[in-house]
Amino acid sequence: MDIFKEISDAIQEGLNSIFERWDLVLWQIAATVILIIVVRIFLWKPITRYLEQRQEALSKELHEAAHERERVAQIRYELQTEYEVMRKEARQMKDTLMSEAQLEKERIISDARNEAKRRIQQVDRDVQQELRLQSEKIRENIKNIAFDVAEKIVSHQVTDENIDEVIDEMLDEKL
């Protein structure tokens, strides 16, 4: 407790000593006021001005960053929208090309079938024509053979014994 008593006495004595010399108190007050004015003029205003400029610069940068962020978001949205549109167009183009290719495939197959039918019909007509021609030749040959056989029979060159030989000879000649 002695320590506290000593501290208390020292503070009391210091306060009493301040007020014993008023001229020192006035000089102290004047020096403090001058110090405050000097600090206010030479330090406070420049520091405040610097801090305000720094605050404005930071605010401006934050505003620009927010603006850039909005711009980036807008560009991203536009690109995403454009990507979706292009993707949709590509899908439609693919579907259109696939359907056109399918139609072209069907057309080519149909044309090939029609061409095959036409060629088969042409071959059938050619075969029928050839059959008619060969039939006519065979008829003509039969007529000629029959006429020749009849001539030989009428001229008495053919007998019952050699008729088969004569017919075979004539067939060999005509064919």
Swiss-Prot record:
Q: Which Pfam families match?
A: ATP-synt_B
Q: Which GO terms describe its cellular component?
A: plasma membrane; proton-transporting ATP synthase complex
What GO molecular function annotation could you give as one example from this UniProt entry? proton-transporting ATPase activity, rotational mechanism
Compartments it resides in: Cell membrane
Entry superkingdom = Bacteria
InterPro entries, sorted: ATP_synth_b/b'su_bac/chlpt, ATP_synthase_B_chain
How is this protein positioned relative to the membrane? Single-pass membrane protein
Which HAMAP family does its entry note?
Answer: ATP_synth_b_bprime
Similarity remark: Belongs to the ATPase B chain family.
Q: How does it assemble?
A: F-type ATPases have 2 components, F(1) - the catalytic core - and F(0) - the membrane proton channel. F(1) has five subunits: alpha(3), beta(3), gamma(1), delta(1), epsilon(1). F(0) has three main subunits: a(1), b(2) and c(10-14). The alpha and beta chains form an alternating ring which encloses part of the gamma chain. F(1) is attached to F(0) by a central stalk formed by the gamma and epsilon chains, while a peripheral stalk is formed by the delta and b chains.
Query: What's the protein name?
Result: ATP synthase subunit b
Q: Which organism is it from?
A: Acholeplasma laidlawii (strain PG-8A)
